[in-house]
């Protein structure tokens, strides 16, 4: 969102959840949503970066901020986060699936199985878990409404594992 588009967008009363929200694009999106008046929840696995982002984002815009340490690949942690968000803000109107990790770009014959499992869990299962929970909340609203944004990288064009997850995420969203 550019500064001019956020000035024209009023998201007062809306709640946005951004996974991987403590750094880079996630933090920038959180700031933009806050400036547009939305309440914003960010989650990240990196506790130190989460504290820094929380300090930087607090007081940005008219919305409130909730920062939580959570592993997007853990369904129980995801449910606890949604419970906290709905207890504080009542709903989730926008979900941004931004959390992702990269592999080491190893050829398939050399891929470490534990790394494979972790990349699939964070980059593909995580957005599925969060989208499922967000849809349940969105559909319970008096007027069902909401938006889910899935962030993917250009790695989908390469032969890397993270790129394959981006392709899988794009296909999940079509169903």
Curated annotation (Swiss-Prot):
Biotech utility: Diterpenoid pyrones display various biological activities and FDDP C shows anti-cancer and anti-HIV activities. FDDP C also shows inhibitory activity of 42-mer-amyloid beta aggregation that is involved in the pathogenesis of Alzheimer's disease.
Binding residues for NADP(+), per the UniProt record? Answer: 18, 71, 98, 132
What molecular function terms (GO) are annotated for this protein? oxidoreductase activity, acting on the CH-OH group of donors, NAD or NADP as acceptor; quinone binding
Q: Which GO terms describe its biological process?
A: fatty acid biosynthetic process; terpenoid biosynthetic process
InterPro entries noted in UniProt: NAD(P)-bd_dom_sf, SDR_fam
> Pathway of this protein?
Secondary metabolite biosynthesis; terpenoid biosynthesis
State the UniProt keywords alphabetically.
NADP, Oxidoreductase
Query: What is this enzyme's EC?
Result: 1.1.1.-
Note whether NADP occurs among the keywords.
Answer: yes
Known function? Short chain dehydrogenase/reductase; part of the gene cluster that mediates the biosynthesis of diterpenoid pyrones. The first step of the pathway is the synthesis of the alpha-pyrone moiety by the polyketide synthase dpmpA via condensation of one acetyl-CoA starter unit with 3 malonyl-CoA units and 2 methylations. The alpha-pyrone is then combined with geranylgeranyl pyrophosphate (GGPP) formed by the GGPP synthase dpmpD through the action of the prenyltransferase dpmpC to yield a linear alpha-pyrone diterpenoid.
Please state which protein family the record places this protein in. Belongs to the short-chain dehydrogenases/reductases (SDR) family.
Name of protein: Short chain dehydrogenase/reductase dpmpG
Gene name, Swiss-Prot/TrEMBL: dpmpG
């Amino acid at each position: 969102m550019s500064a001019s588009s956020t000035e024209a967008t009023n998201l007062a009363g809306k709640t946005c959840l951004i996974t991987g929200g403590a750094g880079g694009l996630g933090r920038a999106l959180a700031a933009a949503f806050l400036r547009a008046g939305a309440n914003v929840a960010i989650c990240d696995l990196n506790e130190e970066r989460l504290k820094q982002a929380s300090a930087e984002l607090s007081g940005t815009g008219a919305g409130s901020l909730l920062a939580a340490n959570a592993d997007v690949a853990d369904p129980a942690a995801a449910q606890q986060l949604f419970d906290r968000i709905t207890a504080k803000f009542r709903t989730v109107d926008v979900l941004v699936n931004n959390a992702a990790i990269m592999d080491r770009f190893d050829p398939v014959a050399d891929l470490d199985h534990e790394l494979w499992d972790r990349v699939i869990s964070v980059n593909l299962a995580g957005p599925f878990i969060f989208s499922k929970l967000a849809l349940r909340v969105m559909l319970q609203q008096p007027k069902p409404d909401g938006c889910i944004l899935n962030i993917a990288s250009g790695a989908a064009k390469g032969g890397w594992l993270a790129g394959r997850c981006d392709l899988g995420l794009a296909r999940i969203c079509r169903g």
